[in-house]
């Protein structure tokens, strides 16, 4: 009976046949199959399109162009692959979106000793040519080759694998980037999306690393996390971590299976693609309530973004009507009007009472000069984006939240310029995802109002007043904490625009 061992699970054996992704007791020529079977489901091999797959094992690189089949169901590493007669011919190893490689004797291959050399993988963009370690348009590459021809060749230090839609190439370069060798395969291929991530528990930020890995794999079609731990009971430590972050999973249809081992555990991630949104740890979309600015969970974010998409954005908010407010009235409209008048003041008095409180459109806070820039960095993005996502509002820094009196903060002019620069910087970093045609920027105004004390003619005490208007579309305080696996095996974070583009409205 043929046996197959996945390299991803430590299955490399130098005494067995080795192919990209597997060691096996048999050497199957997988080029001869046109149909394969996985769990009694039949899948056609894709014609004239291949996957470049590779393993790093014992300082050895094993790479090859392999056949692939299309499957819309999630398959795990190690799942058996059979021919139509019921004979096992391979196991699941590599995946690119909905395509799975068939590991065994494939087409063009590359077997290297990695002692003293590196190897890098690239997607060859359509229309580009290659020289050594760079790709560009043909004329630029031609000039590059002429420039490098004058250099004497040196020993190879790096190999570069270029995978394109119509052709694949392997180049080797010396320390100066001079191309020493080139192989060209007239076959179109894709690179696999790595679907194995290693996490070690007991190290700093291990919970963050685990949640990031889960998000990245779920958003990339699934995969496996290999978990080790500094502690003896790796399975116990893992389950504690998973339980502590279970509330983060924004995709209820996604799930995982845990396979326990003595020294390591494997968490198999399965994404069914039934959820309307990506797996996300934090949306970084905030809304303002009466008492706080709250981060939207994924359902709130979906509802909010769906409304914006349906309406094509929001129109500017009309100006507040002018009218007098009876004593003691503290409705949202009167509070906002009083805040607007306070914002327009040219000067303030220390310990002056403020006749409005925090509301959905107003927030005031106090902070020492020493902590001012730190608090601005930590809190400004979420507060101002929450105003922009609601109906606009005012932030006053230097008003005591308990006594509702003006206290201000005392700083010099140079420091004040730094604070003003910080505020501008953090507002410009806010990301707006537009559903409208105008695509306007965030509108805001910032003032530093002098605070005078009785008997003092000059002052360097201020209240910082920031006014933010309602934004036409969705304002993100930062990029969503939602990741995916790229073809190099790195975890990348979705930009706000990318994240929204993946929502199934």
Curated annotation (Swiss-Prot):
Induction notes from the record: Expressed in the early phase of the viral replicative cycle.
EC number in record: 3.1.-.-
Keyword Kinase: no
Single GO molecular function: 2',3'-cyclic GMP-AMP binding
Catalyzed reaction equations: 2',3'-cGAMP + H2O = Gp(2'-5')Ap(3') + H(+)
Region (Schlafen-like): 239-505
Domain of life: Viruses
Annotated Pfam families: B3R, Baculo_p26, SLFN_AlbA_2
Site note Substrate binding, residues: 60, 105, 149, 169, 182, 184, 186
Keyword Hydrolase: yes
Chain positions covered by the region annotation Poxin-like: 1-238
Domains: entry comment: The substrate binding site is formed by the N-terminus of a monomer and the C-terminus of the opposite monomer.
Miscellaneous note of the record: In some poxviruses, the poxin is expressed as a poxin-schlafen fusion protein.
Protein name: Poxin-Schlafen
Organism: Cowpox virus (strain Brighton Red)
């Amino acid at each position: 009976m043929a046996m197959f061992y996945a390299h991803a699970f430590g299955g490399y054996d130098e005494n067995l046949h080795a192919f990209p992704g597997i060691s096996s007791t048999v050497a199957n020529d997988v080029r001869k199959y046109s149909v394969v079977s996985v769990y009694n489901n039949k899948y056609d091999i894709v014609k004239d399109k291949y996957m470049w797959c590779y393993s790093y094992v014992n300082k050895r690189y094993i790479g090859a162009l392999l056949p692939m089949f299309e499957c819309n169901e999630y398959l795990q590493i190690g799942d058996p692959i059979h021919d139509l007669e019921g004979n096992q011919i391979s196991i699941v190893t590599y995946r690119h979106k909905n395509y799975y490689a068939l590991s065994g004797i494939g087409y063009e291959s590359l077997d290297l000793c990695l002692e003293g050399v590196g190897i890098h993988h690239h997607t060859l963009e359509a229309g580009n040519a290659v020289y050594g370690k760079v790709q560009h348009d043909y004329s630029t590459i031609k000039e590059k080759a002429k420039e490098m021809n004058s250099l004497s060749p040196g020993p190879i230090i790096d190999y570069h694998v270029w995978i394109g839609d119509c052709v694949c190439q392997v180049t080797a370069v010396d320390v100066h980037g001079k191309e020493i060798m080139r192989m060209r395969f007239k076959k179109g291929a894709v690179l696999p999306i790595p679907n194995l991530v290693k996490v070690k528990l007991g190290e700093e930020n291990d919970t963050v690393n685990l949640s990031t890995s889960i998000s990245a794999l779920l958003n990339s079609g699934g995969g496996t996390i290999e978990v080790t731990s500094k502690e003896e009971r790796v399975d116990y430590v893992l389950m504690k971590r998973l339980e502590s972050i279970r509330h983060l999973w924004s995709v209820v249809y996604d799930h995982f299976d845990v396979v326990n081992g003595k020294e390591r555990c494997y968490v198999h991630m399965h994404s069914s693609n039934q959820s309307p949104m990506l797996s996300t740890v934090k949306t970084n979309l905030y809304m303002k309530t009466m008492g706080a600015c709250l981060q939207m969970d994924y359902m709130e974010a979906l509802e909010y973004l769906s409304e914006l998409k349906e309406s094509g954005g929001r129109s500017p908010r009309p100006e507040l009507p002018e009218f007098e407010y009876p004593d003691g009235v503290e409705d949202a409209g009167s509070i906002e009007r009083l805040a607007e008048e306070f914002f327009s003041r040219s000067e303030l008095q220390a310990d002056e009472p403020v006749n409005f409180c925090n509301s959905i459109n107003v927030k005031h806070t106090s902070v020492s000069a020493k902590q001012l820039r730190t608090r601005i960095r930590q809190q400004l993005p979420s507060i101002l984006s929450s105003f922009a996502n609601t109906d606009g509002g005012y932030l006053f820094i230097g008003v005591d939240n308990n006594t509702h009196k003006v206290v201000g903060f005392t700083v010099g002019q140079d420091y004040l310029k730094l604070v003003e620069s910080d505020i501008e910087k953090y507002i410009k970093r806010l990301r707006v995802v537009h559903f409208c045609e105008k695509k306007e920027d965030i509108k805001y105004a910032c003032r530093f109002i002098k605070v005078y004390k009785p008997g003092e003619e000059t002052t360097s005490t201020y209240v910082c007043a920031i006014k933010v208007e309602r934004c036409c579309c969705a304002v993100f305080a930062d990029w969503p904490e939602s990741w995916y696996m790229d073809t190099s095996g790195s975890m990348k974070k979705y930009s706000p625009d990318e994240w929204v583009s993946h929502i199934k409205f």
